[in-house]
Amino acid sequence: MDAIWQGLSGIFEVVLIAGLGFFLAKKGWFWENAAKDLTRLTMTVALPPLMIHSLYANFTHDALIAAAPDLMLPFVSIFASYLAGHVLASLLHISKGRRGIFICTCCIANAIFIGVPVNVALFGEASVPSCMLYYLANTTMFWALGAYLIIRDAGGQHRFTLKEMLLKLRTPPLMGFAAGVILLLANVPIPHFAMAAMKYVGGMATPMALMVIGIQMSQIPLSSIHFDKDLVGAMAGRFLLAPLCLFLLLPVIPVSEMSSKVFLMQAGMPAMTNMTILATAVGADAEYSTTVNCVSLVLGVFFVPFYMYMLS
């Protein structure tokens, strides 16, 4: 019961902060590109120092090495949900122009911008290393498998080279995480004032990210949403199929208690925003992708309590 209440308390925090962003957006407090600007501030300024501070605050050299094997589970579970997404797309007769986006939704989550703040709110900063392990697997699988499917939706056949994939993985949060890992493994001490500064700057990440979610939710045009089989199936894949694949693999690929909680939460996060960006860039069905992103964002608020109940 205590675990459920702890989870619900974290959920209330998430909903209240996102609700504040929603309320202020409806009142006209934000400028036109506020969501984009705050997202950039969160990704490039707040999250990198949060990565380093969290590693130093919650891990030692030996503990970090012991956590590395946990990386296998997210790779296997994402690939399993990728295969399951293919099966579901065939069963529902998803049109070829949407099939890549549909499958991508089933297996790829918004593991960094939404995943990290939600997990930090629920489990504290100790969850950040596990979040980053899932994020590494999630981003790698998106550019290795998902991106090709979306490009194929638009009639293209481009496959990303290893060099292109590595460049796509070079994001500020992952670079911050990599820097923290290298410094910690090298036993490099960080001065107290630097740790304090990183704590304060990194502390902006969760409230800013959640307020951006509220802003984005306030901009969703309800008239453009049609709950057909393509949308309902994608939501089932995102919030039921992906977490189920990971849940079933937990007894097969054992991980730490924290990683098991975080990975399950990460697997059930809303759809990845890069999916819509790529769909727009290559000429795939961007409208469908945008709708999937928006609806998954709203439904994510309601599915988090369900995942917490499963964990308890």
Question: What do the PLM-derived regions correspond to, one by one?
Answer:
Residues 1-312:
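Alpha-helical transmembrane segments of multi-pass small-molecule/ion transporters
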